[in-house]
Design a protein with these regions (language model features):
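N-terminal amphipathic/basic leader segments beginning at the initiator methionine
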Residues: 1-42, 47
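Electropositive phosphate-/nucleotide-binding environments in soluble metabolic enzymes
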Residues: 10, 27, 34, 38, ...
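A common structural microfeature
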Residues: 13, 52, 84-86
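Alpha-helical scaffold segments in soluble metabolic enzymes
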Residues: 15, 43, 68, 72, ...
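Outer-envelope exported proteins of Gram-negative bacteria
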Residues: 18-19, 86-88
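Short acidic capping loops at alpha-helix termini that bridge into adjacent secondary structure
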Residues: 42, 80-86, 114
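Conserved catalytic cysteine-centered active-site region
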Residues: 45-64, 91-114
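Phosphate/pyrophosphate-binding loops at sites that engage ATP/ADP/AMP, CoA/4′-phosphopantetheine
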Residues: 69-85
Length: 114
C-alpha cells in the first residue's frame, strides 16, 4: 500500500515490524554505589527510582549494543539487512562526539539500504 507524499507523490508506509534490545551483563546496584560514595540504596531509590544500572566494559560502545539489538529486530521481523530502509537510533551516550552512532551501527550491522 502506498500513501500520498508531497515530494514524490506516493511513498510506502513506515512501521515498526521488529524489536530488539541488548544491555551489558554487568550490573551495578545502589549498594555498589553506596560503597563508592557517601550515599545509600534508600536515598538513591527515593530520589531517582533507580535500583540498578547496567555497565558496559570500557571496550564496548553504544553501537556494539545497538548492532546486537538491530540484528535481533531484523530476525524477529523475518527480514534481512537488505530489506531495511531506515535505521533510527537515539542515544545520550554516542560512540564519539561528532559522528552518528546510527551510521556506525548501520555499517557494522551491514544494513546497506539506509
Amino acid at each position: 500500500m502506498k500513501v500520498p507524499n508531497s515530494r514524490s507523490g506516493m511513498m510506502p508506509p513506515a512501521g515498526i515490524v521488529g524489536l530488539g534490545s541488548h544491555v551489558p551483563s554487568k550490573v551495578m546496584t545502589n549498594e555498589d554505589w553506596a560503597g563508592l560514595v557517601e550515599t545509600s540504596d534508600e536515598w538513591i531509590t527515593t530520589k531517582t527510582g533507580i535500583k540498578e544500572r547496567r555497565i558496559a566494559d570500557p571496550d564496548v560502545c553504544t553501537s556494539d549494543l545497538a548492532v546486537i539489538a538491530s540484528q535481533q529486530a531484523i530476525e524477529e521481523a523475518g527480514l534481512s539487512p537488505d530489506d531495511i530502509d531506515m535505521l533510527i537510533l537515539a542515544t545520550s551516550s554516542p560512540d564519539v562526539p561528532l559522528s552518528s552512532t546510527a551510521g556506525i551501527t548501520q555499517s557494522t550491522a551491514e544494513i546497506p539500504g539506509c
